[in-house]
């Protein structure tokens, strides 16, 4: 509240994301949707008492579920054919004397900025976050096939509009009424208030408060929100089983094999587990359970190919992996380079990005008793470009 008056945040999330090629509000960045991140800006503002989220028709339940747990009551309503229509629907559902309208595709605004806009709106009737232009601004003829400069504007008079934009409810309602059907053409709410002849206060905005509009903005947002690298650790053991093939790192060795549902390639399994861990995808058993006949006797290199593909779906590629085998037998060093090549081929990377080494465990434990083989692995994943 401000001066005892309720303040309601309206999230404009009714668009289809046509310019970005995706429904921007549902895009997940850094483990959280853009909509939820933008809503958190308003929810974290002490002045805001509740939220109204305007979503595409039919997505009301999804919108409310997406914003659950933010600490403020949430109501979802259906949007209209244009932004101004959607905000009008949100305004009708808001029960505050002051409203803050915020783009659902601006997740980087601060709660402090929202508070300053709300305070100015309560005091002056209408306010918006904006940045003074720092570049020289040219005016050109709209829609010209070959754009040409008509004039150079005095950049001291030019401000670049952001959101939140705040209003006394009555001021915004009167602006909509004055505009009539032409309100749908407005690209922001302050334009309606200006057209109605009411003053609008400029509140200094934030340079990082950009709107996710196109693919370049998505990439910029990902770079800010998602870690460029991730690491995972894998561990696996298998006991020796006479009569089975012994496969390590995709290479067949002489001697008793290892017991397992697949080919029991403990080296590949540890690497796969490390990659799954780095990508936040659980473990090997979740994806390739020993109850599934599809994986019976299969080469573990095939599992690695599947795992690399699953990581790629999450936007990751394998940067490098390092595996240590603990085994009294067989001798690994003579065939380590061959193992590196096989593992790298399955992962779609260079052998230079794979390291294989071994230890005998100094004769201790089940390895020292030659009961089986263990493998420890670490994998580094790198965020894929684009």
Swiss-Prot record:
<dbReference type="GO" id="GO:0016114">
    <property type="term" value="P:terpenoid biosynthetic process"/>
</dbReference>
<feature type="site" description="Transition state stabilizer">
    <location>
        <position position="360"/>
    </location>
</feature>
<keyword id="KW-0414">Isoprene biosynthesis</keyword>
<feature type="site" description="Positions MEP for the nucleophilic attack">
    <location>
        <position position="155"/>
    </location>
</feature>
<feature type="binding site">
    <location>
        <begin position="283"/>
        <end position="285"/>
    </location>
    <ligand>
        <name>4-CDP-2-C-methyl-D-erythritol 2-phosphate</name>
    </ligand>
</feature>
<feature type="binding site">
    <location>
        <begin position="288"/>
        <end position="292"/>
    </location>
    <ligand>
        <name>4-CDP-2-C-methyl-D-erythritol 2-phosphate</name>
    </ligand>
</feature>
<feature type="binding site">
    <location>
        <begin position="359"/>
        <end position="362"/>
    </location>
    <ligand>
        <name>4-CDP-2-C-methyl-D-erythritol 2-phosphate</name>
    </ligand>
</feature>
<dbReference type="InterPro" id="IPR001228">
    <property type="entry name" value="IspD"/>
</dbReference>
<feature type="binding site">
    <location>
        <begin position="261"/>
        <end position="262"/>
    </location>
    <ligand>
        <name>4-CDP-2-C-methyl-D-erythritol 2-phosphate</name>
    </ligand>
</feature>
<dbReference type="GO" id="GO:0046872">
    <property type="term" value="F:metal ion binding"/>
</dbReference>
<feature type="site" description="Transition state stabilizer">
    <location>
        <position position="19"/>
    </location>
</feature>
<dbReference type="InterPro" id="IPR003526">
    <property type="entry name" value="MECDP_synthase"/>
</dbReference>
<comment type="similarity">
    <text>In the C-terminal section; belongs to the IspF family.</text>
</comment>
<dbReference type="GO" id="GO:0019288">
    <property type="term" value="P:isopentenyl diphosphate biosynthetic process, methylerythritol 4-phosphate pathway"/>
</dbReference>
<feature type="site" description="Transition state stabilizer">
    <location>
        <position position="24"/>
    </location>
</feature>
<keyword id="KW-0456">Lyase</keyword>
<dbReference type="Pfam" id="PF02542">
    <property type="entry name" value="YgbB"/>
</dbReference>
<comment type="function">
    <text>Bifunctional enzyme that catalyzes the formation of 4-diphosphocytidyl-2-C-methyl-D-erythritol from CTP and 2-C-methyl-D-erythritol 4-phosphate (MEP) (IspD), and catalyzes the conversion of 4-diphosphocytidyl-2-C-methyl-D-erythritol 2-phosphate (CDP-ME2P) to 2-C-methyl-D-erythritol 2,4-cyclodiphosphate (ME-CPP) with a corresponding release of cytidine 5-monophosphate (CMP) (IspF).</text>
</comment>
<keyword id="KW-0479">Metal-binding</keyword>
<feature type="region of interest" description="2-C-methyl-D-erythritol 4-phosphate cytidylyltransferase">
    <location>
        <begin position="1"/>
        <end position="229"/>
    </location>
</feature>
<comment type="pathway">
    <text>Isoprenoid biosynthesis; isopentenyl diphosphate biosynthesis via DXP pathway; isopentenyl diphosphate from 1-deoxy-D-xylulose 5-phosphate: step 2/6.</text>
</comment>
<dbReference type="InterPro" id="IPR034683">
    <property type="entry name" value="IspD/TarI"/>
</dbReference>
<feature type="region of interest" description="2-C-methyl-D-erythritol 2,4-cyclodiphosphate synthase">
    <location>
        <begin position="230"/>
        <end position="386"/>
    </location>
</feature>
<dbReference type="Pfam" id="PF01128">
    <property type="entry name" value="IspD"/>
</dbReference>
<feature type="binding site">
    <location>
        <position position="366"/>
    </location>
    <ligand>
        <name>4-CDP-2-C-methyl-D-erythritol 2-phosphate</name>
    </ligand>
</feature>
<feature type="site" description="Transition state stabilizer">
    <location>
        <position position="261"/>
    </location>
</feature>
<protein>
    <recommendedName>
        <fullName>Bifunctional enzyme IspD/IspF</fullName>
        <ecNumber>2.7.7.60</ecNumber>
        <ecNumber>4.6.1.12</ecNumber>
    </recommendedName>
</protein>
<feature type="site" description="Positions MEP for the nucleophilic attack">
    <location>
        <position position="211"/>
    </location>
</feature>
<dbReference type="InterPro" id="IPR026596">
    <property type="entry name" value="IspD/F"/>
</dbReference>
<comment type="pathway">
    <text>Isoprenoid biosynthesis; isopentenyl diphosphate biosynthesis via DXP pathway; isopentenyl diphosphate from 1-deoxy-D-xylulose 5-phosphate: step 4/6.</text>
</comment>
<feature type="binding site">
    <location>
        <position position="369"/>
    </location>
    <ligand>
        <name>4-CDP-2-C-methyl-D-erythritol 2-phosphate</name>
    </ligand>
</feature>
<dbReference type="InterPro" id="IPR036571">
    <property type="entry name" value="MECDP_synthase_sf"/>
</dbReference>
<dbReference type="GO" id="GO:0050518">
    <property type="term" value="F:2-C-methyl-D-erythritol 4-phosphate cytidylyltransferase activity"/>
</dbReference>
<feature type="binding site">
    <location>
        <position position="236"/>
    </location>
    <ligand>
        <name>a divalent metal cation</name>
    </ligand>
</feature>
<dbReference type="GO" id="GO:0008685">
    <property type="term" value="F:2-C-methyl-D-erythritol 2,4-cyclodiphosphate synthase activity"/>
</dbReference>
<comment type="similarity">
    <text>In the N-terminal section; belongs to the IspD/TarI cytidylyltransferase family. IspD subfamily.</text>
</comment>
<dbReference type="InterPro" id="IPR029044">
    <property type="entry name" value="Nucleotide-diphossugar_trans"/>
</dbReference>
<dbReference type="InterPro" id="IPR018294">
    <property type="entry name" value="ISPD_synthase_CS"/>
</dbReference>
<feature type="binding site">
    <location>
        <position position="269"/>
    </location>
    <ligand>
        <name>a divalent metal cation</name>
    </ligand>
</feature>
<keyword id="KW-0808">Transferase</keyword>
<feature type="binding site">
    <location>
        <position position="238"/>
    </location>
    <ligand>
        <name>a divalent metal cation</name>
    </ligand>
</feature>
<feature type="binding site">
    <location>
        <begin position="236"/>
        <end position="238"/>
    </location>
    <ligand>
        <name>4-CDP-2-C-methyl-D-erythritol 2-phosphate</name>
    </ligand>
</feature>
